[in-house]
Design a protein with these regions (language model features):
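Conserved hydrophobic/aromatic packing and binding residues within compact polymer-binding modules
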Residues: 5, 19-20, 30-33, 61
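Short, charged recognition helix plus adjacent turn
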Residues: 8, 40, 52, 60-75
Length: 75
């Protein structure tokens, strides 16, 4: 079952401020990425970083967009 970025963060027992600190961005940026509008604009590279923090894979995360197979598989 796929989860939202927010659910993945909560499952990892992290606060938005924890993630912001690890990424070196303002808390508002993390809030935006967790919003429907923000998650639709997230880059694959940022998704990989967040998944690393959350202990999951991009396949575990529900996003309102689909990345092309070549971008996901690297080829």
């Amino acid at each position: 079952m796929k989860v939202s970025l927010k659910a993945a963060r909560v499952n990892a027992e992290l606060r938005q401020s924890d993630v912001a600190e690890k990424l070196g961005v303002p808390v508002d940026r993390v809030k935006y990425l967790e919003s429907k509008e923000g998650s639709a604009k997230i880059t694959y590279e940022m998704l990989l970083v967040l998944c690393s923090l959350y202990g999951c894979t991009p396949d575990d995360i529900f996003l309102p967009i689909d990345y092309p197979k070549s971008e996901v598989s690297g080829g």
